[in-house]
Amino acid sequence: MARQQAPPWVHVALILFLLSLGGAIEIPMDPSIQNELTQPPTITKQSVKDHIVDPRDNILIECEAKGNPAPSFHWTRNSRFFNIAKDPRVSMRRRSGTLVIDFRSGGRPEEYEGEYQCFARNKFGTALSNRIRLQVSKSPLWPKENLDPVVVQEGAPLTLQCNPPPGLPSPVIFWMSSSMEPITQDKRVSQGHNGDLYFSNVMLQDMQTDYSCNARFHFTHTIQQKNPFTLKVLTTRGVAERTPSFMYPQGTSSSQMVLRGMDLLLECIASGVPTPDIAWYKKGGDLPSDKAKFENFNKALRITNVSEEDSGEYFCLASNKMGSIRHTISVRVKAAPYWLDEPKNLILAPGEDGRLVCRANGNPKPTVQWLVNGDPLQSAPPNPNREVAGDTIIFRDTQISSRAVYQCNTSNEHGYLLANAFVSVLDVPPRMLSPRNQLIRVILYNRTRLDCPFFGSPIPTLRWFKNGQGSNLDGGNYHVYENGSLEIKMIRKEDQGIYTCVATNILGKAENQVRLEVKDPTRIYRMPEDQVAKRGTTVQLECRVKHDPSLKLTVSWLKDDEPLYIGNRMKKEDDSLTIFGVAERDQGSYTCMASTELDQDLAKAYLTVLADQATPTNRLAALPKGRPDRPRDLELTDLAERSVRLTWIPGDDNNSPITDYVVQFEEDQFQPGVWHDHSKFPGSVNSAVLHLSPYVNYQFRVIAVNEVGSSHPSLPSERYRTSGAPPESNPSDVKGEGTRKNNMEITWTPMNATSAFGPNLRYIVKWRRRETRETWNNVTVWGSRYVVGQTPVYVPYEIRVQAENDFGKGPEPETVIGYSGEDLPSAPRRFRVRQPNLETINLEWDHPEHPNGILIGYTLRYVPFNGTKLGKQMVENFSPNQTKFSVQRADPVSRYRFSLSARTQVGSGEAATEESPTPPNEATPTAAPPTLPPTTVGTTGLVSSTDATALAATSEATTVPIIPTVVPTTVATTIATTTTTTAAATTTTTTESPPTTTTGTKIHETAPDEQSIWNVTVLPNSKWANITWKHNFRPGTDFVVEYIDSNHTKKTVPVKAQAQPIQLTDLFPGMTYTLRVYSRDNEGISSTVITFMTSTAYTNNQTDIATQGWFIGLMCAIALLVLILLIVCFIKRSRGGKYPVREKKDVPLGPEDPKEEDGSFDYSDEDNKPLQGSQTSLDGTIKQQESDDSLVDYGEGGEGQFNEDGSFIGQYTVRKDKEETEGNESSEATSPVNAIYSLA
């Protein structure tokens, strides 16, 4: 009967079961164990996969391995057996598989190129090296060529191609002149990654040198030089400015593939005049700041150690003042195989189960191939104890015959990985690896560890016993580690004795003993005191020591922390140091150091030496004061369920009495390693009862305090754990706030270790709609927040958070009120526009019907217009209680369009729009009334701080700013960008409780009640801008200025307190920026975002019009025309006779209003003004013309001096009567100037 195959879930279950098994056996590094145990071979050293060698040296291909017995080696070349014995040039090193190919007797290294693989074999298996590809380095010569001079126009782009000869490895390229001077590279001239030299625009100075491409080859250490290029630059009178264009890469898009772990290099080189600047961006995200860096004057972007998240679209932006272009590079990240779980050597005992796992990833997904002893697993003899499940080999009930070396080969199109892992089956009884019957001496109250290293297969079980009896030592004051070491946390006298460790497995047992002796600590109980002595007297410093009598005591002295030389004037005894005939050089600090081979203790005193005339009247005043020494020998007694007594020995007060002792504690569950203050006690006590919280593993230390400062903390006490209990409190600072319009986030401050009272602290969160009597919703949370979803907009909720641990629940929690998320408000109701007179427009409105949150104010946008002519948009922000506003009109004929919207924390809602009434003297517009214009940047630099609806105006219309008169009026001496903000109200405005209505008319708002930033003013130039603002923060507050250019590059500038105004100095001419100011301590408090534009920079490339040929020719033509007209006039004047007046008479008057072209909105009373063209003298007469026979005297509108055919009626007189020029005609001259009227 054929064997039925198990379903797939059986294999999965088996793998999960094996994962739960203990780890494999590790062989210790003990040489005796290593030499005794048998072991399959393991590759320990090999050459790299791509092995490039120097043809001038002998070839060395490394392969070394270990095993017991020692392995033998053989090689394959190009997958075929490589017979070393047949080639006299090839030899193998002794006790190694390393190949040496010797060319001293001749031969060509190229003949040995190929793919090599090493095999290490003993009777337990065969291990394989990587497939090593051997290549010989090549450095070919540059082909001979004659290069003609390169002719290029000044300002044009140029590429000098290098085209180096192919080498192995690729050579390093650099450019130099024929005189071996390096070519200076900058933003305009630079070398690309391909080795070519790029000129963004050629200048005349580029002819001063030649250009030679050089290739440096690594292995041969040689440099090949290409014939140099010479440039011939054709000059012009002026170099035309050009928009950027890409020299490399070509086109608007390209793609690039890179392997994971490699470096990604993107390059963009552009031409243009002026030289373009290059900026880099990633579509849909930011550049990785930790891996990205810019090279080659920003023309190259390098991203190191590429990973899959670095794939995507990158684009470079090349820009100068003439314009900008961009090139998009689509980056695809592939991956050669890399290890997720590399197979490890497996050492098992007979009958044990185990597994080999080989998991790798890559792009595309790599395939896995198993081999055993170098042969495919499919062709190996069947083994019933072995099963292959994809990337895992499962071994069950292994036996000695199961020993082998397995290879996992995982590969894709980009590379491969090969790993060896052997399976060794050992049956070894337990063995002790440390010396027997060790003696360990320790000091009382210290921590110590007793080691007992062991080995066996199967892995033995280790137990500890004391004095040969009793139960296994583990728990309480003892802790046994996995390696067999026994730790005693705090040594006491009763811990002295003989400790036995016993290792046991199915093959037997082994034991070892360790004798522990506990010694008393060394203590100085009579310390030397600070002394003041006169010169020439005798001084004695005491130092009496208590120590363990079984230990040898050594007492030594230090002066100023250096070993003291005991001379003839000094006498050292067991318990003192005497100094005879004290001199000034004896002044300083003296340290008594008492030490044994296990510990030591120190005590310090200061000796002050006075001159003969000095008298130590105030001894303490002469002694230096210092911080106290640390307390020592902490001891816990009177252990109770909720209290413990802590006792300590005070340290030296260093001439300043100890005023306080601070007791600190540390717990190892919530914040291990962090010390907290527990209590404070007077300096006169050295013992105190500490009240404790349930379920805390306490450890204490003590700090002494005097008037100089605090001592170093004492060494920590032993730990003491209290029993658990239900919590006695609940978390604080419970809040409910919406982060979106349809949710509510419930947060609280989590409880600390001293309030948890038990294990598994958690929180029961309850919520329901306020005043609905609904059933409470509840959930158990382990963190400090919970988000309730699918909530209505801005609805109040009742919230409760209760603490709970494994011992029970905390007290009933208090109910707090939270709100779900806000949304945009509806439009203000009953928006009304009234015009009581021609100078004032009054606005009134009611609060929105649906605030959808807390109203923080209103935003009014309004713009004046006259027909299709549009003025500048104005923006006003109001407090949430304001419902009236007045606008003072700039002129009596302009109308206004208003847009009013309410604001919540989310933003501005739907707007209510109205228009002012039509003035009585305004002409009916031919087009639809204009809507609010978008915020635009004018040439003056005055910019609105908020957006508005775009205006659809005809192309003939000219937008003219009309600024209404507003009270109070603010006149700025510089053109600036200003914004206003309004503080948020703390309560919601509703129709049930109408707020107090206020009226205001303003441009710049006054400071709000809450902390805010307003009146941000920007004074821009071409490359810098000055920023000022107003705020109502406390003095000393720091701010941050954040601005973003039109390329979406964001920068921030920290501003110290009282540092206004500040200057932004890294701006670009003619670029638009958005800017805001916010508090450094609270980014949520920010000014309104404003927009401004820097002015266009002046460049020296601007052409002088007076030097242009076309202008000179035009001037010459005008001069010639004027000369011809003068000659004609002279001829006509000299001829006399009849004048051809018909042409003059038929010319119609064509008045043109310069104000109409100018687009002015000025109005004038033409009936009450003198005609602009008249030039009346003081006596009311028109002045005599320069020529008596001028044609003006015979123009239309005068008395009839011509007949119907245009001939003269009378003779042409030399002088006309003065009276003919007087009368009513003088006020109605027919000059064309008089026909010009202002068109309102």
Swiss-Prot record:
Residues 982-1001 have a biased composition (Low complexity). Its main location: membrane. Residues 1132-1240 are cytoplasmic. Isoform 2/isoform 3 is phosphorylated at P12. Dephosphorylation is required for ankyrin binding. The chain crosses the membrane at residues 1111-1131. It is found in: Cell membrane. SUPFAM superfamilies: Fibronectin type III, Immunoglobulin. The modification Phosphoserine is found at S485, S1160, S1174, S1187, S1190, S1226, S1227, S1231. Residues 710-740, 902-942, 982-1002, 1141-1240 are annotated as: Disordered. PROSITE patterns: FN3 (PS50853), IG_LIKE (PS50835). Homophilic adhesion is primarily mediated by the interaction of the second Ig-like domains. This is Neurofascin. It comes from Rattus norvegicus. The lineage of its organism: Eukaryota, Metazoa, Chordata, Craniata, Vertebrata. The gene is Nfasc.
